[in-house]
Structure formats: C-alpha cells, structure tokens
C-alpha cells in the first residue's frame, strides 16, 4: 500500500444557474470522471479517494453552463487502467468528447 494517508475528497456543491452561458462550442479541456469503485477499481498508489463524479453528473453541469465539447483527463487514482476514461468517452460520444490517457513508460507502438 502507501506510506501516506489517503485523503478523502469533499463532494461538490450544488450547480447554480449562471448569469450567462458559455459561448457556442465551448470546450472544457481538463476534467476527470470518477466512476463507481465497484466498476473502476482505485489504484493502491492513489493519493486520495474521490467522490463519485460520473458522466450524468458532469453532463448536468455542462448543460447548465453551456459546455458542448470536452477533453477528459485520466485520473491518477486509476493508474494506467484507462477503462473509466474510455467508457466515459463512449458514453459522451466521440462527436463531443476526447481523452488523455496514461500508459506505462514501456508501452510499445503496437500496444497503442
């Protein structure tokens, strides 16, 4: 396990209606999706325990503020298991979402 204490994240506050929505085609270029731990196991090397922040929760926020496109960044709590990232892109749809994955340093071009 770790040689440190794992910090529990605080849940996000309620989403409030903005005075103005974001301009058309606004893109969120860095956010994480945290799925249920039963489906997406956490790395034993993680530094924190996330609150559930899944695709439906993100879409509620994005639709409220006017975000149309998104780039999901692999969360460190999953190490190099990109399952949550890939499943999230599929759920958002490739017309809307892209992702930044994490791979081992010794990954080969064929594996990519």
Go through the PLM ranges and name each one.
Residues 1-112:
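Helix-coil boundary/capping segments in enzymes
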């Amino acid at each position: 396990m770790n040689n440190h204490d794992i910090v529990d994240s605080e849940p996000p506050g309620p989403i409030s209606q903005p005075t103005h929505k974001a301009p058309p085609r606004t893109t969120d270029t860095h956010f994480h999706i945290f799925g249920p731990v039963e489906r997406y196991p956490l790395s034993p090397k993680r530094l924190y325990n996330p609150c559930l922040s899944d695709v439906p929760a993100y879409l509620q926020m994005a639709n409220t503020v006017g975000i149309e496109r998104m780039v999901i960044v692999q969360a460190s709590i999953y190490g190099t298991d990109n399952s949550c990232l890939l499943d999230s892109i599929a759920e958002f749809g490739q017309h809307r979402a892209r992702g930044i994955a994490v791979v081992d340093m010794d990954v080969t071009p064929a594996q990519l």
